[in-house]
Design a protein with these regions (language model features):
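Compositionally biased terminal segments of proteins
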Residues: 1-174
Length: 174
């Protein structure tokens, strides 16, 4: 996956395209190591054409597209998969302002703050096929980062992106 991280770093520098590393790698950066087979990043939707152009130049092709994300696979190395989540500029700027630097095996990346990563995971868990994995990540992040998220913050995240019942269940892990 180092090749994908290196590519993302080069795109950021060459095109001044801010992006955040999300998904399993960001979960690992926040202290919960788990296997992941792809790389996920987050961009402002306004930067999507530039990102797609750069990925195409680097040998990637889009093989799945939904309103909020696109999945890319390398044409010659199909096990290299990059998911690009797209959000509006206001959401991205809020997350960018609070993001953290992270050294990914010598490659400088940025990851969402813990509260924003939890919001992404709780939002993703609303999709039936993702509940187990994403809520597992949420529980592991809460357990691995005691005291970093208050009960009120968790309640607010769940109210906005999940359900009140979920907040009640998760608060036991604070």
């Amino acid at each position: 996956m180092r090749i994908v991280f290196d590519l993302l770093m080069r795109i950021q520098k060459r095109r001044q395209l801010p992006l955040l590393l999300i998904g399993g790698w960001a979960v690992q950066a926040h202290g919960y190591a788990r296997n992941t087979l792809d790389v996920d990043c987050l961009i402002a939707i306004e930067n999507d054409p530039v990102m797609a152009e750069e990925l195409t130049k680097a040998g990637f092709e889009c093989f799945e597209e939904k309103p909020s994300f696109r999945r890319f696979r390398h044409r010659l190395q199909p096990f290299l998969i990059l998911d690009v989540m797209r959000v509006n500029a206001v959401t991205f700027e809020k997350m960018w302002a609070a993001c953290e630097d992270y050294d990914m095996d010598g490659i400088p990346m940025r990851i969402p703050a813990l509260k924003h990563l939890l919001a992404l995971k709780i939002h993703a868990a609303q999709n039936e096929h993702r509940v187990e994995k994403d809520l597992g990540d949420v529980l592991a992040l809460l357990r691995g980062n005691p005291g970093k998220i208050s009960a009120a913050e968790l309640q607010g995240i769940c109210d906005q992106y999940g359900t009140p019942a979920l907040a009640e269940k998760l608060s036991a892990f604070l």
